[in-house]
């Protein structure tokens, strides 16, 4: 009961922070750290994921909880007094499936995660008043499906147009810290919080036992990283596009951004080409580079007498965003509409993971396999089950059934499981059918 009241108190305090930021949009807030007390730290700990990999100190949640009150009180005192020292993050490289490449991820210590969460709980209510409606990534009450819906409705209302598919090269590694300091100055000038943010930015990364201190960027994987990236691109892209670009355009335009994935759509081709020309210069001013091949202009007008069957490939007539390929197709009433289907790379990755799982777990009890595969299918439907994507999720469900049958057949030397026998098994251990969960018509 006490913890519930504490959470309610924190929510009220965050609401007051939000109200202050909303009423004074140009004010730099100088006294914020006093909000972070022991109650705040306990709530930050509650919200922190505790099942992830450990940081450089090797401390697990179980170890930290042995003296939780004392540990949080000590962390709070070090934070307030300035004695807190940010340890380096442990860098690991995660394979990018199907590419042979890797993506670096920084793993903070548990204590770092807790303090970052506490600071985020202060910063988030403030910046939520500033961030624009075009930004959807890692924000309360927003997510990829809201971004997809906004994009769909925007493109449909514009009747399609010209799309800039934006790709920022190594965003987290090249973010300029001096510019970040300038952006932070506009809103947050509390000495304790700014000092701590600086320590995180300069803590370095530990890789193969050596600590490196890159001059640019911020470690990917920290609790504080999403709000930092949102702030940076809010200043570099969102505000610039809304206040400097759009007023100079001839036609309508829109921006949809999810973290560092962004897409710009224009009704007028000349507008799109002019913006595409200046984008590299704009990003270059802030230390960022656009990928020269992946950043491209797509003619995303609906097919017509002069464009239908013009010989362009599907890639030239479509674009991918948030795991979906967007293209024009006919509705049931015969009208051209923007349609979405699971991107080929995402479908291949999902099936590859199912194959790996079935191979490893083929000797588990059939009931246990059914439960796990059902969970995987429902998770797939929960994300990819959107209007117009029924064919792709049905194909995924069918492939999962085939993969399961294949690996069940290899449980013994008795021979391949016939479809007749397997169908009887499916009646006893059914898998959930494909289901559309998100409808664009419900928004």
Model-derived features with residue positions:
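Non-catalytic terminal/accessory segments
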Residues: 1-443
């Amino acid at each position: 009961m006490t913890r519930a009241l504490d959470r309610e108190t924190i929510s009220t305090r965050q609401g007051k922070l939000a109200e202050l930021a909303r009423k004074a949009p140009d004010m730099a807030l100088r006294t914020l750290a006093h909000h972070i007390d022991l109650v705040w730290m306990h709530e930050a700990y509650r919200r922190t994921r505790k099942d992830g990999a450990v940081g450089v100190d090797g401390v697990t949640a179980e170890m930290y909880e042995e003296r939780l009150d004392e540990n949080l009180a000590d962390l709070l005192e070090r934070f307030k007094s300035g004695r807190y020292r940010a340890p380096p993050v442990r860098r690991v490289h995660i394979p990018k499936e199907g590419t042979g490449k890797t993506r670096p991820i920084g793993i903070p210590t548990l204590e770092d995660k807790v303090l970052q969460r506490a600071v985020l709980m202060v910063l988030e209510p403030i910046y939520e008043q500033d961030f624009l409606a075009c930004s959807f990534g890692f924000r309360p009450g927003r997510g990829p499906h809201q971004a997809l819906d906004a994009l769909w409705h925007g493109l449909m209302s514009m009747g399609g147009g010209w799309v800039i598919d934006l790709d920022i090269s190594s965003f987290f590694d090249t973010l300029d810290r001096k510019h970040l300091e300038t952006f932070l100055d506009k809103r947050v000038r509390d000495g304790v919080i700014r000092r701590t943010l600086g320590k995180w930015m300069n803590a370095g990364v530990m890789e193969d036992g050596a600590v490196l201190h890159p001059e640019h960027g911020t470690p990917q994987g920290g609790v504080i990283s999403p709000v930092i990236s949102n702030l940076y691109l809010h200043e570099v892209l969102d505000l610039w596009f809304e206040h400097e670009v759009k007023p100079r355009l001839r036609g309508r335009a829109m921006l949809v951004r999810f973290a560092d994935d962004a897409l710009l759509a224009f009704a007028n081709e000349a507008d799109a080409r002019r913006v595409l020309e200046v984008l590299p210069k704009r990003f270059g001013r802030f230390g960022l580079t656009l990928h020269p091949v992946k950043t491209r202009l797509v003619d995303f007008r609906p097919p017509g007498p002069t464009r239908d069957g013009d010989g362009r490939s599907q890639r030239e007539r479509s674009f991918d965003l948030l795991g979906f390929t967007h293209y024009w197709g006919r509705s049931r009433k015969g009208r051209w509409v923007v349609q979405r289907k699971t991107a080929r790379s995402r479908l291949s990755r999902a099936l590859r993971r199912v194959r790996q799982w079935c191979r490893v777990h083929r000797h588990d009890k059939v009931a246990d396999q059914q439960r796990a595969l059902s969970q995987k299918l429902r998770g797939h439907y929960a994300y990819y089950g959107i209007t117009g994507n029924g064919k792709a999720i049905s194909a995924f469900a069918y492939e999962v059934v085939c993969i399961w049958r294949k690996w069940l057949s290899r449980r013994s030397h008795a021979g391949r499981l016939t479809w007749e026998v397997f169908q009887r098994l499916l009646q006893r251990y059914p898998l959930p059918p494909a289901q559309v969960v998100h409808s664009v018509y419900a928004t």
